[in-house]
């Protein structure tokens, strides 16, 4: 029996996540102290052919977070990158805003340095 659409989607998501983990390792090797998180449709698993890749670049301070976000863009591993400090990430993912709570619920850590 052939592959189902669900099988193909799982395979494509696994391939994309594998590439993102590899790219995250390269970026984080040069940016110590940070972490990268996938969020949005690719993290939730409801992506389609038009979905972009959304990444959070999290670091101890604003300067490091911005440098990490720039490195993600330079590596071309994401379409949209948000830079947050560790404190901002913890406050937002655990706060009252339903948008950020949803991001925190489904975000997948791509790497930690």
Regions found by a protein language model. Name each.
Residues 1-37, 44-50, 58-113:
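Catalytic core of pol beta-like nucleotidyltransferases
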